[in-house]
């Protein structure tokens, strides 16, 4: 069962990403390290598989960079 967009946003916020707004259903998130990611879709929508992979990849990269 796919995650909801709101769940992806929660994961990003738990990992220190800041919501920088956006147009329409797009939301831009910025991490203090400079990492950027855009999530599209309304909060209750199912996330696309590529969105889930992108968020997991971005969180993993940020966590690895913080360890250095």
Task: Please give the residue ranges for each predicted region.
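Polyanion-binding surface elements
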Residues: 1-16
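A short, structured beta-strand/loop element
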Residues: 19-45
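C-terminal structural segments of small proteins and small subunits
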Residues: 43-68
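Extended, charge-rich alpha-helical interface modules
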Residues: 14-15, 37, 64-68
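Hydrophobic aliphatic residue packing
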Residues: 5, 9, 37-39, 55
């Amino acid at each position: 069962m796919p995650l909801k967009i709101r769940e992806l946003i929660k994961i990003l916020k738990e990992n220190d990403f800041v919501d920088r707004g956006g147009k329409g259903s797009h939301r831009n998130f910025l991490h203090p390290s400079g990492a950027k990611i855009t999530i599209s879709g309304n909060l209750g929508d199912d996330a696309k598989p590529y969105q889930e992979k992108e968020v997991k990849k971005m969180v993993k990269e940020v966590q690895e960079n913080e360890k250095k």
